[in-house]
A protein has these predicted regions:
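Active-site regions of metal-assisted phosphoester/phosphodiester hydrolases
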Residues: 5-86, 90-97, 111-140
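A basic- and aromatic-enriched beta-loop-alpha substructure that forms the phosphate/nucleotide-
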Residues: 1-3
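Nucleotide-cofactor and metal-assisted catalytic machinery
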Residues: 106
Length: 140
């Protein structure tokens, strides 16, 4: 997994376990966590690592290829665990060539700032996944 970010962000963590990788960048207003989870990646271990990274007081965006379809399994362990922590899953259209939503984006509004967002889908001829483009801005 590669993470690209602007100068106002700083790299906070990289975690690589058997079956998943996590990268976190942060700035004063926002934490962003990127994930790749293979089909065999342990979801309990993934959530445990995320709980250690998430600051519940801070607005946080989590996104990545979870390899779990929220259309087929809307109450899967990852989605239900993140919902319990105050996250909302915002991807609503298929992101995979087979028609599933296996690429997720979760947002939790913290005490510090509130975000508004726009999500765009970018079909790619060279991949079985659509690209997702998330634009965010602060709401006053």
């Amino acid at each position: 997994m590669a993470t690209y970010y602007k100068d106002r962000f700083k790299h906070a963590a990289n975690i690589s376990k058997d079956g998943f990788s996590i990268s976190k960048v942060e700035c004063k207003e926002l934490d962003i966590i990127g994930i790749y989870r293979s089909q065999d990646g342990n979801v309990q271990d993934l959530i445990k690592e995320l709980k250690d990274l998430i600051d519940s007081r801070k607005t946080t965006v989590i996104g990545g290829d979870m390899n779990i379809c929220v259309l087929r399994k809307p109450n899967n362990y990852v989605t239900s665990s993140l919902k319990e922590m105050g996250f909302q899953q915002i991807v609503s259209k298929a992101t995979h060539i087979d028609g599933g939503i296996i690429d997720h984006i979760y947002i939790a509004q913290g005490e510090n700032v509130k975000l508004a967002w726009n999500l765009e889908y970018f079909p790619k001829y060279y991949s079985d996944h659509d690209g997702l483009g998330l634009t965010t801005w602060l709401v006053e």
